Amino acid sequence: MKKLLAIFLLFPCVLYAEAPKQFPNVSGDVLMQMQADRVISTTKEGVSPNNGFIYIEPNIALNFNRNWSTKTQWRLQPNNVLTTRDSANPERYRTFLQSDRGALSVGQESLLVEELKLNFENDDLRFFAGKFDPTFGTAWRKSKRIGVFASQFNEDYNLREKLGAGITALLEGSQITFNTFMNDTTGLSNSALRKRGVASSSNRVAGNGGALSSYSLSMEGKNLFGIENWFYNFGYRNLAVGKVEGRSREVARVVGSEYLYKVSRDTSLIPFIELVSIGNFGGETGRNARYATMALIGKYSAWTASASVVARTIDQPQTSSKISGSQVQFSIGYKFTDNFTIDVSRANIKEDGNSGALIGTTLSYLYKF
């Protein structure tokens, strides 16, 4: 009788059990964003007041079995707003106070191959090879939702579009990653739709020092020193350059921390800090840079509010001067669903000796499949 009762109780579980995954299969997500911002005031002449653009980021994986897959990331973005080809500032992701702004950047969109890699993963480690973004820092991640502008400011020190390989040790509550790479100067560094051209292999920027002669090491995790909800990240990178006078290896370090303090079931506070020090930024000897991000994020139910300060200082060895930039931002956001959010920000920005006040909004939708 007991056996019959056990079979009866287990039968619905068997009937509705999830069918085993069939391989190969395709999985991933697509981040779609629409951003609009307006320069309220500025000391710089010739700045167009309005700007709007669409950003789309598909992450697609072709899974051969439970361990092996090919992973890709694509970016559809406007070349005149978001770029990595600023000759004066090779690390610059976005110049906020610029004349090339439009109410909607139609016709400026480029489709970039951000990542294209072979990936192996089991319970203990992850190995990948191909084109990828090495890990260094976290303040540039859009998922942080530190307002509209902070992630674009901090993209300056994000490592992007490299060719090489990496391995990650998947530990309990943390992971350690080692990458070895060089800049992508192949045809994959070009773009579809609006062409940006192939990246130069002879422009002497950091990362163009030869095959796999650059590397990075990072550690990211949670529950630091056993304290629940204390998240952290550490990173080191060393980028090679050619043996040319006035050029030296870029060496950088990052340390970041954030703590999730739960006030109640629906309310939490998150203090966040990330500090970055970069020597020979871009490969130029003596061009040293420092970035600091501090934020306080409050969450109540579906609402998010934050105040943040981002500062950068870059030494200019040729003129024995410093270029300082900063961003003070206040933001409020709302999450309609787990995948659909809106953020509105007011920011005071200092950039290249000029200052300005901006207001911006971003609509974000994440489609998973």
How should each PLM-predicted stretch be described?
Residues 22-36, 68-74, 127, 174-178, ...:
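Transmembrane beta-strands of outer-membrane beta-barrel proteins
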Residues 23, 61-69, 122-125, 171-174, ...:
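Outer-membrane beta-barrel channels and translocator barrels
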Residues 47-56, 109-114, 121, 159-165, ...:
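Residues that define the transmembrane beta-barrel architecture of outer-membrane proteins
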Residues 53-186:
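Outer membrane beta-barrel
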Residues 108, 134-164, 168-259:
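Outer-membrane pore/translocation modules
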Residues 176-177, 212-322:
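Detector for outer-membrane/organellar transmembrane beta-barrel domains
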Residues 334, 355-369:
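Outer-membrane beta-barrel "beta-signal"
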